[in-house]
Curated annotation (Swiss-Prot):
Compartments where found: Nucleus, Nuclear pore complex; Nucleus membrane; Endoplasmic reticulum membrane
Biological role stated in the UniProt entry: Essential component of the nuclear pore complex (NPC). The repeat-containing domain may be involved in anchoring components of the pore complex to the pore membrane. When overexpressed in cells induces the formation of cytoplasmic annulate lamellae (AL).
Native source species: Rattus norvegicus
Superkingdom to which the source organism belongs: Eukaryota
Site label Cleavage, positions: D531, D532
Keywords: Endoplasmic reticulum, Membrane, mRNA transport, Nuclear pore complex, Nucleus, Phosphoprotein, Protein transport, Repeat, Translocation, Transmembrane, Transmembrane helix, Transport
Annotated Gene Ontology cellular component terms: endoplasmic reticulum membrane; nuclear envelope; nuclear membrane; nuclear pore
Name of protein: Nuclear envelope pore membrane protein POM 121
Region called Pore side, residue ranges: 76-1199
Residues found modified as Phosphoserine: 83, 244, 319, 322, 325, 345, 355, 367, 370, 408-409, 412-413, 416-417
């Protein structure tokens, strides 16, 4: 309490004058104890006040603790309090002095202490409010004074004074609407309890007020602001620390939007005339260019600001790393010296931008003119450069930044650079039209090209001017002048420019410097973004290539050949298409349809090998294409992976991309589907897989989303078929090939591989792409299955976030889509899509089980889940949601998923339920998934699936079969992989194995072990870990599971044990933790056995990913049981019996046993495929990478 109280008090203290005075008054009125307490609190508050973060936390604590304490306290000291209150009511002044103490006990306790519950708080609050209001702005001094006066005034009539004070406050801040509200509140405040509570809140409000000068924020009830705004507040605080008050930061976006356009326009007009005035034609051109650039920049900045608000952008910034942040600081902070040093911190740069924006705007106008005069900075400098101009040395750099800007500005969001760049140009063009549309566009291009050309081609007047600003004499000289010019510029902009000519010598130096700086900067950026930026910008091909290449390796085996051809079209198809939004799309699209269909055949035929490969290829390609987009997992992976291992820089950028992509692109989504597929192959490659993780979350997200997108698009259907085929074959085969070891590798390897493909691999499914899969889907399932599985894996990984949906259906959830999709769904589910839209979901989705799609719809999601629905929703929602394997979970996931996204949902099927188990049936099963009886089997043949239920997972199989039952549980969320990062694989890999029990490792589950698919752990799939963390929450990234990752839970939810099932059950944890999952579970999974999914851990672990892979879904291979999903033994997925068979080997992963059923997961088949290894997880790239990504993501969210 004391800390909270202190924090609260700190808030008051912040209001200092009032607080202090109040404290004094309190001391007098309240008495020694009250005064001492008030002083102590004030001191604490002051200390806290110094630390923004601490203050924020303190405020929260204070609010909760104050209310609680005050309430509990109230009874304790009603006498003193009531008496004080009464007195305060009776005597306004006395109330003020005395009230503080009483207030303390009744409401806030220590916090409130200073104020009386009624009168005390009222006046005090008013004062505080006044101080708050006053504090934010210049009025602040006045306000505090007014409050000071007010205390005296108030005393005369307790009630009237408060109202009058309220009115006064209003008058003081007529613009503030809240004050009006406050008066009404004040009467309640008088009531002590409400007052104190509100009072506590008030300090919070005050914070917001400080945040935004806009009194509005302060005025608004802080309760909402505290929660909702709080993030902003925190960021604001950060900015405040940097330099300007929070106010500036908050205001900038809005003001920027409003102000910047006008000033810019004005500038443009003014600049144009000045340009004409400019004696040198070059100068004129320069000016025009500068204006254009500036507008562009402004637009970009605005976009950035908006985006910045969004996590995606933040992620991009993070991914871009120093490049972007450095950029912003120089540019954003006009002043910047301080900021410049901080280029590293995005937040700061943003904050500084905000604060500087106002300055910049002022300087901008002048600066812009000066800029115009300065050709130099012109474009690159843009208004910001004006400030930068002050640093002549920096200027080159800033220009470089700017230059990248168009390409890079996008830097902030690589993906955005892709999609946005075109958009920005359009926007810029629109804005610039008056100034010079054509020119602006040219400049843009130029800028993009410029990095190389400009340096090489100083000859080009325009570029040069833009770049080096040779025309501008010394860039430093002129720029400095610019600052001087700011004021003078308006008067004589032209005149000044000539003098700068002296700077020409400087210009030469500057040019060199600029070149160097630009080269360095570009190198830096390029390193990060080379592949990213150039490829994306340039063409898909390049990107594709690499991925492709990687893919090949991955596919290695069969795939490679196929992959080449297919790849580009297929994965690309969607991913690119969507993703690229631009270049890729065109090529992509056509291919898409064709591809889809074509792929299908190839896929089908080769199904396995080829399929994979093509998929992979495409995936990769997509990914690269997408790259920017992220596209899908693959991409992501690629990217991610790349970064991880390969390119690293590119990778990074890719990762960024991924992140951004998702947001940025829809395309991304497409990729997603691909993703899956991609992934898979990679899986085989192993390396691929990893990458996925790397991107991991980011990727995932996109991926899924992508999928959806694609789904949505034509692709959906198309995809389906293609995907379908692909998936099955691909995934499986791939998997198979890779098979176990791949898996492992994947997880583990992956890393090493890094290969871009890596990521893709994950994809797993690619399929997904197929989502389509579904189409096939179901059948696929089996086949798909594999694919799916793969997909799943991939997905998982990838998408993870997204959804996964294993089964999703989820998508279906989207069901609707679903259906179709549903198929699509496929494992992979887009879910995200789904999330996305529904439809997409579809795609994504994956649906394990599809069929059901409908179910899907059902909820799809669910693995079977019925839940689905929820899940579905979730799924969709979630988008991510993996939904549990079991879908459902989905749901739950959903929600969480959502967040988490995870949804996974494996199942779909809806059926619900997921049933469990995988096995569904199992109901009884429990056993197994596979239903033990075979049936269930994953695939169960469907047979039986008995439960059939559908889901058939594959039919049959249903993943989960029926049963579902519920377990659903939504929890699901867990998601496959729980995010955890691990995602499927959770990093850790280790883990667990799907089944692993181990949990340990988690395998699936990420990290933490947790997860274990199977684990018995219960955790099960998820578990454990899940629990581990779970929580789904996660957000996580996780990928797979995201979220929570943990939880994964594959399954789910339910926990219940039941569930088992795939999971499920888990439920429980799912979400949360629970974890459970257990894939398999055996029932119950939870523990059930064990085994669960996979029992045996095998480490394999499903997940493992990371590491090892393991996971393999089925992994098979290994047979060794190990894995297998079912691992053998272990029980196998399918439980035992069969199981163990299951796959036992069968490699299979079999989900289901294969053997048994052949179906079995592996099995056979299809799913099985054996080899396949499914790898669900894939991996993730490294946990470290994933964690980093997650951390980034989370930060952005926090922001």
């Amino acid at each position: 309490m004391s800390p909270a109280a202190a924090a609260a008090d700190g808030g008051e203290r912040r209001r200092p004058p009032l607080g202090v005075r109040e404290g004094r008054g309190r001391t007098r009125g309240c008495g020694g104890p009250a005064g001492a307490a008030a002083l102590g609190l004030a001191l604490l508050g002051l200390a806290l006040y110094l630390v923004p973060a601490a203050a924020a936390l303190a405020w929260l604590a204070v609010g909760a603790s104050a209310a609680w304490w005050g309430l509990s306290r109230e009874p304790r000291g009603p006498r003193g309090l009531s008496s004080f209150v009464r007195e305060s009511r009776r005597h306004p002044r006395p109330a003020l002095t005395a009230s503080p103490l009483p207030a303390k006990s009744p409401v806030n306790g220590s916090l409130c202490e200073p104020r009386s519950p009624l009168g005390g708080p009222d006046p005090a609050e008013l004062l505080l409010m006044g101080s708050y209001l006053g504090k934010p702005g210049p009025p602040e001094p006045a306000l505090p004074q007014d409050p000071r006066d007010r205390p005296g005034r108030r005393p005369p009539s307790r009630s009237p004074p408060s109202s009058s004070t309220a009115q006064r406050v209003h008058h003081v801040y007529p613009a503030l609407p809240t004050p009006l509200l406050r008066p009404s509140r004040r009467p309640p405040h008088r009531d002590c309890g409400p007052l104190s509570s509100r009072f506590v809140i008030t300090p919070r409000r005050r914070y917001p007020i400080q945040q935004a000068q806009y009194s509005l924020l302060g005025a608004l009830p802080t309760v909402c602001w505290n929660g909702g705004h709080k993030k902003a507040v925190l960021s604001a605080r950060n900015s405040r620390m940097v330099c300007s008050p929070v106010t500036v930061r908050i205001a900038p976006p809005d003001s920027k939007l409003f102000r910047s356009p006008m000033p810019e326009q004005i500038l443009s007009t003014t600049l144009s005339s000045p340009s004409s005035n400019a004696p040198d034609p070059c100068a004129k051109e320069t000016v025009l260019n500068a204006l254009k650039e500036k507008k562009k920049r402004t637009v970009a900045e605005e976009d950035q600001l908006h985006l910045d608000g969004q996590e995606n952008k933040r992620r991009r910034h993070d991914s871009s790393g120093s490049g972007h942040s450095a950029f912003e600081p120089l540019v954003a902070n006009g002043v910047p010296a301080a900021f410049v040093p901080k280029p590293g911190s995005l937040k700061r740069s943003l904050a500084s931008q905000s604060s500087d924006d106002h300055l910049n705007k002022r300087s901008r106008t002048s600066s812009v003119s000066s800029l115009t005069s300065t050709c130099t900075g012109g474009i690159p400098s843009s208004s910001r450069n004006a400030i930068t101009s002050s640093y002549s040395s920096t200027r080159g750099v800033s220009q470089l930044w700017k230059r990248s800007g168009p390409t890079s500005s996008p830097f902030s969001s690589p993906a955005s650079s892709r999609s946005q760049t075109p958009e920005r140009p359009a926007k810029k063009t629109r804005e610039e039209e008056p100034c010079h549309q054509s020119s602006s566009s040219a400049p843009l291009v130029t800028d993009k090209e410029s990095p190389g050309e400009k340096v090489t081609d100083p000859a080009t007047g325009k570029q040069q001017s833009l770049w080096t600003s040779p025309p501008t004499p010394g860039s430093s000289g002129q720029r400095k002048r610019k600052i001087q010019l700011l004021p003078s510029r308006r008067g004589d902009q032209l005149t000044l420019p000539p003098p700068p000519e002296l700077g020409y010598s400087i210009t030469a130096e500057d040019l060199d410097m600029e070149r160097r700086a630009s080269l360095q900067w570009f190198n830096k950026v390029l390193e990060d973004k080379t592949d990213d930026a150039s490829t994306p910008a340039t063409d898909t091909s390049p990107a594709t290539s690499p991925p492709f290449t990687l893919t090949l390796p991955t596919v290695g085996p069969a795939a490679s050949p196929a992959s080449l051809p297919a790849p580009s079209s297929n994965p690309l198809l969607e991913s690119l298409k969507k993703m690229q939004e631009s270049p890729a799309p065109s090529s992509s699209e056509p291919p898409e349809a064709a591809t889809v269909a074509a792929p299908s055949p190839p896929k089908t035929p080769s199904l396995l090998a080829p399929l994979v490969s093509p998929l992979t290829g495409p995936l990769a390609s997509t990914s690269s294409d997408s790259k920017p987009t992220t596209t899908f997992l693959g991409l992501a992976s690629a990217s991610s992976a790349t970064p991880l291992t390969d390119t690293k820089a590119p990778g990074v950028s890719q990762a960024q991309l991924c992140v951004s992509t998702p947001a940025a692109t829809a395309p991304s989504p497409t990729p997603a589907s691909t993703l899956f597929g991609m992934l898979s192959p990679p899986a085989s490659s192993s390396s691929l897989a990893t990458p996925g993780p790397a991107c991991a979350s980011p990727m995932f997200k996109p991926i899924f989303p992508a999928t959806p997108k694609s789904e949505s698009d034509n692709p959906l259907p198309t995809s389906s078929s293609a995907a379908t085929t692909t998936p099955a074959s691909t995934a499986l085969p791939t998997t198979a090939t890779a098979t176990a070891h791949t898996f492992k590798p994947i997880f583990e390897s992956v890393e090493p591989f890094a290969a871009m493909p890596l990521s893709p691999p994950f994809s797993l499914k690619q399929t997904t792409a197929p989502a389509t899969t579904a189409a096939t889907s179901a059948p696929l399932l089996t086949g798909l299955g594999t694919a799916t599985s793969t997909v799943a894996t991939g997905t998982t990984a990838s998408a993870s976030k997204p959804v996964f949906g294993f089964g999703v259906t989820t998508a279906a959830s989207t069901a609707s889509t679903i259906a179709s999709t549903s198929q699509s769904i496929l494992f992979g589910g887009a879910p995200p899509v789904t999330a996305s839209s529904s439809a997409p979901a579809l795609a994504s989705i994956f649906q394990f089980g599809k069929p059901l799609a409908p179910a899907a719809s059902v909820a799809g999601t669910s693995f079977s889940q019925s839940l689905a629905s929820s899940a579905q929703t979730a799924a969709s929602n979630s988008s991510g949601g993996f939904s549990g394997f079991g879908g459902t979970l989905t749901t739950s996931t959903s929600a969480p998923a959502t967040t988490s996204q995870p949804t996974l949902t494996f199942s779909n099927t809806v059926t619900p339920t997921f049933n469990i188990p995988f096995s569904a049936s199992a109901k009884p099963a429990l056993p197994t998934y596979p239903g033990a009886n075979s049936q269930p089997t994953f695939g169960a043949t469907d047979g039986a699936t008995k439960p059939a239920l559908a889901p058939s997972f594959g039919s049959s199989f249903t993943f989960g079969n029926s049963v579902a039952s519920a377990p659903s549980a939504a929890p699901a969320p867990a998601a496959f992989g729980g995010a955890a990062q691990p995602a499927f694989g959770g990093l850790k890999a280790s883990a667990s194995t799907f089944g692993t029990p181990a949990s340990t490792q988690p395998a699936f589950g990420s990290t933490t072990s947790v997860f274990s698919f199977g684990s018995a752990t219960t955790s099960g799939f998820g578990a454990a870990a899940a629990t581990t963390q779970t929580t789904h929450s996660g957000s996580s990234s996780s990928l797979f599971g995201s979220s929570t990752p943990s939880p994964f839970t594959f399954g789910g939810s339910a926990a219940p044990a039941g569930g088992g099932g795939f999971g499920l059950s888990a439920t429980p944890g799912t979400g949360s933790t629970s974890g459970t999952f257990s894939f398999g579970s055996g029932q119950s999974g939870t523990t059930g056995t064990t085994t669960s999914f996979g029992g045996s851990l095998s480490q394999n672990t499903l997940g493992a990913p990371s590491q090892s892979s393991p996971f393999a879904f089925s992994v098979g291979s290994t047979p060794e049981s190990k894995p297998v999903f079912g691992g053998t033994s272990t029980p196998t997925f399918g439980q035992s019996a069969p199981a163990p068979g299951v796959g036992t080997t069968g490699s299979s992963l079999s989900f289901g046993a294969p053997s048994t059923p052949a179906q079995g997961f592996v099995g056979v088949g299809p799913f099985g495929s054996g080899a396949p290894s499914f790898s669900i997880g894939a991996g993730s790239k490294t946990p470290g990478a994933r964690q980093r990504l997650q951390a980034r993501r989370q930060h952005t969210r926090k922001k």
